Amino acid sequence: MPGFTTHYLFGVKAYNDLPNNYLKHVISKYRWLYQLGLQGPDIFFYNVPILRHRDYRNVGSHMHEYQVNDFFKNSLLELSEIRSRQQKEEAAAFLAGFMCHYIADSICHPFVYGRIQFQTDKKKSECHGLHAALENDIDAILLWKFKHKKPSEFNQAASLCLNTQESQFVSRYLSRCINRTYYQITEKNNFQVTEGMVARSIFAIRFGSRILSDPAGHKTHLIGSVESIFLKHPIASKKLVTDKLSAKVHEILNLDHEVWTNPWDHSIASTASFPDLYQQTLKKCNAVYYYLNAFLIANVPAGPPDMSALLAELGNYSYHSGLDVG
């Protein structure tokens, strides 16, 4: 997946590209919720107790691979059932950011996995470090290009300054959307995502982004030294955010247009560079936001507005492979 900063930058550009419509007004009004949405289900990857699960209860991982279109359908249904105008707009701003995250992941993630030559039949732990390092490099390059800042000069946590009311609302809204899609109570399932889980995940991503900051590279060197004793493939040290790139820019972004393949389907080969995929992502966001705005302004006397065009534009793709999840 693109990293924290890349998702943020995608969202800023997608917002700036919007015409002066209702959706743009809503996002500007509730920018913190939009910016939280830009991190998508990744917020759950910072919540350590959730990560202990290796099955469908690993919320962030499960959402990346299953019932993707159903989640957006249920999120729109939940939104349409909200009576408060303020809360309806808060949900819309958050959901717009979430959609941007999904689009960026489904388009750019195959590039990341392809470039590190990920093999689906091997343990994911072997590629975690390479994956994180490439994401951090892309973060650093785009941050310098668009903000003229180094990673050490960009406070990720400051992009998530929700107030208490916003945090409480989005915790309730997101938990309802997730449970409606993935965790309805049945004879076989008694697990659900609580408002508290979401709230703790929001806190965790803000806290985690501070912990992972390593401007001078001291943490990276120390943790890397310890990891080298116990691990063949470093993980934690590669996730730390530094100002140093691990390779040359043209290699990181594939500016030479070398061939890479989708690890989940090697018949899908591409020479696309990351800038190519960046433009593709923004084009897709523009189309999705057009239909989302139409959904939000539709005046339907009874029941939710028609969402078929929006759901069709979103598709049903894995956040990891970019392939249809069926």
Located regions from the model:
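N-terminal leader/auxiliary helical segments
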Residues: 1-97, 102-326
